[in-house]
């Protein structure tokens, strides 16, 4: 019976390991044991220096999903593929439950169908400025221009609210609650 397993691979080698696993599967007659290999990715829109660029990002860096019939032979085959670290579960691979599989596959399909905005800043969000004259200042987002990849932030300078305009998304980061020390 085929079940889904999560396999840890070397980070930044996910595509290479997936291809090696697929090629080796075909050449070594393991097609009856390994049904499908998925590398969960999503398309992310990044804006840097005013340019929009769609890039592929791994949903789970360092992991592949493998649908397989687990036997000693198939386990050893996958485990010995170059770039594979281990099965989730360690010494004894643990299959994903049906609910987990359904949730994961639905999530992957939803992310395949569109492009995700990398930065999801909203008016009222607290951010820290990481670049420019106001580096390390923490403020509140007052305007967001998603089409340009820019925003405006209100910061407190000598007790007075001052607007910092034309910041690019990459120049700020969201501040977690409790992390604010102006």
From Swiss-Prot:
This is Transcription termination/antitermination protein NusG. InterPro entries: KOW, NGN, NGN-like_dom, NGN_dom_sf, NusG-like, Rib_uL2_dom2, Transcrpt_antiterm_NusG, Translation_prot_SH3-like_sf. The gene is nusG. Signal peptide: none annotated. One of its GO terms (biological process) is transcription antitermination. It comes from Chlamydia pneumoniae (Chlamydophila pneumoniae). It comes from the Bacteria. Gene3D superfamilies: 2.30.30.30, NusG, N-terminal domain (3.30.70.940). The lineage of its organism: Bacteria, Pseudomonadati, Chlamydiota, Chlamydiia, Chlamydiales. GO terms for cellular component: cytosol.
């Amino acid at each position: 019976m085929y079940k889904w397993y999560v396999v840890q691979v070397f980070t930044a080698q996910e595509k290479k390991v997936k291809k090696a696993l697929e090629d080796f599967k075909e050449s070594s007659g393991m097609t009856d044991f390994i049904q499908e290999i998925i590398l969960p990715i999503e398309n992310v829109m990044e804006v840097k220096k005013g340019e929009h660029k769609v890039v592929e990002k791994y949903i789970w860096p360092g992991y592949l999903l493998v649908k397989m019939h687990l036997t000693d032979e198939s386990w050893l085959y996958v485990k010995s593929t170059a770039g594979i670290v281990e099965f989730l579960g360690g010494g004894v691979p643990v299959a994903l439950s049906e609910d987990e599989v359904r949730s994961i596959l639905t999530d992957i399909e939803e992310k395949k169908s569109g492009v995700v905005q990398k930065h999801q800043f909203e008016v009222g969000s607290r951010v820290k400025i990481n670049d420019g004259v106001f580096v390390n200042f923490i403020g509140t987002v007052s305007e967001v221009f998603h089409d340009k990849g820019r925003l405006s932030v209100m910061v407190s300078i000598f007790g007075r609210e001052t607007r910092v305009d034309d910041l690019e998304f990459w120049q700020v980061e969201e501040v977690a609650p409790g992390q604010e020390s102006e």
